[in-house]
Regions:
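C-terminal alpha-helical interaction module
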Residues: 1-210
């Protein structure tokens, strides 16, 4: 797609990509932008009741998104690709401080980060949570705890996973194959079989979503 968009492109090819199939052009390759575009530019294609970026919560969502990215979404990568023990130690500390704070926030039983309304903040968090025990915990060495060791976060993740539209997007085999194919971190290319708990959860959620 990158060379179709620009014949002589020689840079990195990253995902996700939003591609215009009619114009044969790349619209955007930044996940945060694409997420917000789905909520605005494609409003006519989604139910009117869904608004992942409501005006009254916009400032709070922006603050949460900024914090999530720096401490957790990107934090796991800082740990996984750290080139020194000091950098790794700092990154891992930040990751688990963030998870500890999220555990406290979600311990009041709220279904979503902002309370009773599903927002883009939940989507941003979910994509890291669903990958954590499967890939980040082992491959990125963020192994102080698993998501399964955080009762409130685990319950929150399961609630999101039980939303059919979300469950249908999860493919643990693809997640594991993608991450464990990173030669710098896993030279053998061996893909682990587990963990069984999350596989069973995803299997049940996808069955209910069918």
């Amino acid at each position: 797609l990158y060379t179709r968009a620009a014949k002589h492109y020689t840079g990195r090819a990253t995902v996700p990509v939003l591609w215009d199939m009619k114009q044969n052009v790349m619209v955007n390759n930044e996940s945060a932008d694409i997420l917000r575009m789905f909520n605005s530019a494609f409003r006519d294609l989604s139910p009117a009741t869904i608004d992942l970026y409501p005006t009254q919560l916009a400032e709070e969502i922006d603050e949460m998104a900024h914090w999530l990215y720096n401490s957790l979404n990107n934090g796991v990568y800082k740990a996984g690709f750290a080139s020194s023990q000091i950098a790794y130690n700092e990154a891992v500390k930040d990751v688990f401080l963030a998870l500890d704070k999220l555990e406290i926030r979600l311990s009041d039983g709220r279904p979503f980060l902002m309370g009773t309304h599903l927002t883009e903040a939940d989507i941003r968090l979910f994509v890291t949570l669903i990958r954590f025990d499967v890939a980040y915990h082992g491959l990125f060495k963020t192994n102080l705890k698993r998501i399964a060791d955080y009762p409130a976060i685990q319950t929150y993740m399961e609630q999101l996973l039980n939303i059919p539209e979300i469950a249908k997007t999860v493919n643990l085999d693809h997640i594991k194959a993608g991450y464990y194919s990173i030669k710098a971190l896993n030279p053998s290319g061996i893909i682990p079989k587990g963990p069984l708990e999350i596989e069973q959860l995803v299997k049940a959620a996808k069955k209910n979503a069918a």
